[in-house]
UniProtKB/Swiss-Prot annotation:
Protein's recorded name: Poly(A) RNA polymerase cid12
Subunit note: Cid12, hrr1 and rdp1 interact forming the RNA-directed RNA polymerase complex (RDRC). The RDRC complex interacts with the RITS complex via interaction between ago1 and hrr1. Clr4 has a role in mediating this interaction.
Alphabetical UniProt keywords: ATP-binding, Cell cycle, Chromosome partition, Cytoplasm, Magnesium, Manganese, Metal-binding, Nucleotide-binding, Nucleus, Phosphoprotein, RNA-binding, RNA-mediated gene silencing, Transferase
Lineage: Eukaryota, Fungi, Dikarya, Ascomycota, Taphrinomycotina
Signal peptide: none
The UniProt record lists the keyword Cytoplasm: yes
One matching Pfam family: PAP_assoc
Phosphothreonine found at: T327
Function summary: Has a role in the RNA interference (RNAi) pathway which is important for heterochromatin formation and accurate chromosome segregation. A member of the RNA-directed RNA polymerase complex (RDRC) which is involved in the generation of small interfering RNAs (siRNAs) and mediate their association with the RNA-induced transcriptional silencing (RITS) complex. RITS acts as a priming complex for dsRNA synthesis at the site of non-coding centromeric RNA.
GO cellular component, one term: nuclear RNA-directed RNA polymerase complex
Domain PAP-associated: 209-263
Binding site for Mg(2+): D77, D79
GO molecular function list: ATP binding; metal ion binding; poly(A) RNA polymerase activity; RNA binding
Gene that encodes the chain: cid12
C-alpha cells in the first residue's frame, strides 16, 4: 500500500548544514501551493459560482476545509459548500449537468451520501468537492481556523501529517483511511493533552520531536479499544459511557465531534490497524539521526499534478502573449 515515491536529490531540504526544523519547513514550502496556484484556486471558485448561477441565480458559496483554515497543500482539493439558497434534488442534478458542461464531463453527483456532493477535477488537476448546505463542515473549519490562529504549530504539523497520509495512501476515508477532519482533531486533542493543559508551549518544541511523539502516542500509547477522544479539552471518555463500543471491531478510532457530540468522527477509519502500524514505523524512523527524513517523500502523483498545473498555466500564458502580439500588430497596421 502507498504511492510511488521519488528519490529526489537536488532539492532544498537535502542541502548540508540545515537544522531539522529548516529541512522540514523547506519540504513544507515545496509541497505548498505557490502564489500563482493560490490565485488559480480563487479563480476556479469564481468560475464555479458563475456556472452554478446559471441554475441557481442567487447561489452563494462558502469555502471550508484547508483553503479556509490556511493549511492547503498542492495536492489538496477545493472544499466548498452551496451555502444558500437551499436546493432540491432537481436543482442539484441540474448543477451537476452544468458543471459537466463547463468544468469536468465526468463530474460525479453522490445523491445518497450523508451530505450530498459533487466531485469533479479541473483541467489543472485540482479536485473540487462541492457539497450542499454543509453547515457542520463550515462551522468545523471556523473552529479549526481559530485554533490555528492561536496555535500556528497546529497548521504546520497538520500539513506535514496530511502529506504523510497521502504518501501512504491512507488519507481516503472511503477506503478506511483517516479523513482530514479526524486527523485535525487527533492533532488538537494530542496537543491539548500533552502540552497546553500542562502549560507547556508547543510552539517552541522542535517539530521533528513533535512529529515523533505524535506518531508514538497514536501508534503505541492510545488505547483504541477503551477510549473516545474529546479533542478541544484533551479529555478521555470511556467508549462504554458514550455507547460507541463496536463489538465486531472494538479497536476503531473514536473522536467526539465538537460540533455534534453524538457524532463519532473516527469510526469510518476501519483500516486503523494498518494506520497504527504506519504510525509506529514512522515514530521509530524519526528517532534515527541518519534516516529520519525518509519519513517524508515526494510522490509521483504530485509531480504529475504539478506538471499538469504548469501546462495549464503555460498554455494560458501563451494565449495571452499571442493575443497581445496580435493586438500590437493590428495597432501598427491601423497606424500605418
Amino acid at each position: 500500500m502507498g504511492k510511488v515515491l521519488l528519490e529526489l536529490h537536488s532539492v532544498p531540504w537535502n542541502e548540508e548544514g540545515l537544522s531539522d526544523n529548516a529541512r522540514l519547513y523547506s519540504f513544507l514550502e515545496f509541497v505548498s501551493p505557490k502564489i500563482e496556484e493560490l490565485k488559480y484556486r480563487k479563480l476556479l471558485l469564481e468560475k464555479l459560482q458563475t456556472h452554478i448561477r446559471e441554475v441557481v441565480l442567487d447561489a452563494e458559496l462558502q469555502v471550508y476545509g484547508s483553503m479556509y483554515i490556511g493549511t492547503t497543500l498542492s495536492i489538496s482539493d477545493v472544499d466548498v459548500s452551496l451555502k444558500s439558497p437551499r436546493v432540491g434534488e432537481l436543482e442539484k442534478r441540474r448543477v451537476t449537468m452544468v458543471l459537466r458542461k463547463y468544468l469536468d464531463a465526468d463530474a460525479d453527483f453522490h445523491s445518497s451520501a450523508r451530505v450530498p456532493r459533487i466531485n469533479l477535477v479541473d483541467v489543472s488537476g485540482i479536485g473540487v468537492d462541492l457539497t450542499f448546505g454543509n453547515d457542520k463542515a463550515c462551522r468545523t473549519a471556523e473552529l479549526q481556523k481559530a485554533y490555528n490562529e492561536e496555535h500556528p504549530i497546529f497548521g504546520r504539523l497538520l500539513m506535514l501529517l496530511k502529506h504523510w497520509l497521502f504518501e501512504r495512501d491512507l488519507e481516503n476515508v472511503h477506503h478506511g483511511g483517516i479523513a482530514s477532519c479526524a486527523l485535525s482533531y487527533m492533532l488538537i486533542g494530542w496537543l491539548e493533552m500533552r502540552f497546553h493543559k500542562k502549560g507547556i508551549d508547543s510552539e517552541v518544541q522542535p517539530i521533528r520531536a513533535l512529529l515523533q511523539k505524535f506518531f508514538y502516542f497514536w501508534g503505541v500509547e492510545w488505547t483504541y479499544e477503551l477510549f473516545v477522544l474529546r479533542p478541544l479539552t484533551g479529555q478521555i471518555v470511556p467508549k462504554l459511557q458514550k455507547g460507541w463500543l463496536n463489538e465486531v471491531q472494538p479497536n476503531l478510532l473514536s473522536i467526539e465531534d465538537p460540533i455534534d457530540r453524538n457524532n463519532d468522527i473516527g469510526k469510518q477509519s476501519f483500516q486503523i490497524s494498518m494506520i497504527k502500524a504506519a504510525f509506529v514505523a514512522s515514530a521509530n524512523e524519526l528517532l534515527s539521526d541518519k534516516t529520519w527524513f525518509s519519513t517524508f517523500a515526494i510522490t509521483e502523483d504530485e509531480m504529475f499534478l504539478c506538471k499538469q498545473f504548469e501546462n495549464v498555466i503555460n498554455t494560458k500564458r501563451s494565449l495571452v502573449e499571442g493575443y497581445d502580439s496580435d493586438t500590437e500588430s493590428d495597432e501598427l497596421q491601423a497606424g500605418g
